[in-house]
Amino acid sequence: MIRSMTAYARREIKGEWGSATWEMRSVNQRYLETYFRLPEQFRSLEPVVRERIRSRLTRGKVECTLRYEPDVSAQGELILNEKLAKQLVTAANWVKMQSDEGEINPVDILRWPGVMAAQEQDLDAIAAEILAALDGTLDDFIVARETEGQALKALIEQRLEGVTAEVVKVRSHMPEILQWQRERLVAKLEDAQVQLENNRLEQELVLLAQRIDVAEELDRLEAHVKETYNILKKKEAVGRRLDFMMQEFNRESNTLASKSINAEVTNSAIELKVLIEQMREQIQNIE
């Protein structure tokens, strides 16, 4: 299915440990580039997160952010560092004996850094939940890419219909263009009072017809339209293939324009270039 490289997804999970939020956004990029913003507690997850993203995406500049809010009330049982507390009491008593001033305040002792500590949360268990949420965020992210991709596909198919219409238009004008050019050549020869044998005249007319004949270019344009429709139906990433097809379209439209000797064909060649450029702009967004 066609996917856009531009997308956004957000998913939040909550547990007894607190809450975590994943945010993913991406823009156009020739290859896949990943950027991460992870809290210090889960910085070690970066290789795992990168691998999961790379296993499901192929192109785009992807920014992945994790926000973690621990629940302070769920920090666990407070633990007293008895050894440090005793050292502080001993030191405080010594100071008091030296100055004979002040009283030892137990609360001040407890407030001293490192005396009291909350029991650490099980970060491995939390990480497992966070990674499961990442998979869900990736699901949402891909759905967003596919939704936007279907819109891009519709726009491209609309332009392909325009290309087909221009090909039909040019093909319908070719008999009258060839006849007009034949009459024009004969008239020029008569004005110049040049007499050519019938065989020679026919040879000149054949050469002229070959120079201005665009049937081959029209056939190739029709083939490119058909192939582009087939590519749009594929399930894998097709952005690069579509980009290559636009190069082929451009080549044929340039040749068509160079052979044009009629205003109708010239206008169609210009319209083809416009349609091809519009498709190319949309394809820049496709994975």
From Swiss-Prot:
Question: Mind telling me which InterPro entries this protein's record contains?
Answer: YicC-like_C, YicC-like_N, YicC/YloC-like
The Swiss-Prot or TrEMBL record lists the needed cofactor(s) as: a divalent metal cation
Q: Without the gene, what phenotype results?
A: A double yicC-dniD deletion in rich medium makes filamentous cells with little DNA in stationary phase, has no growth defect in minimal medium, does not grow at 45 degrees Celsius. Slight decrease in suppression of RhyB-silencing of a sodB reporter construct.
UniProt-listed Enzyme Commission number(s):
3.1.26.-
Q: Which UniProt keywords apply?
A: Endonuclease, Hydrolase, Nuclease
Cite the Pfam families for this sequence.
YicC-like_C, YicC-like_N
Tagged with keyword Nuclease: yes
Q: List the disulfide bonds.
A: none
Q: Name one GO cellular component term.
A: cytosol
What is said about its interaction partners and assembly? Might interact with PNPase (pnp).
NCBIfam families in the cross-refs: YicC/YloC family endoribonuclease (TIGR00255)
Q: Which family does it belong to?
A: Belongs to the YicC/YloC family.
- State what protein this is by name: Endoribonuclease YicC
- State the organism of origin: Escherichia coli (strain K12)
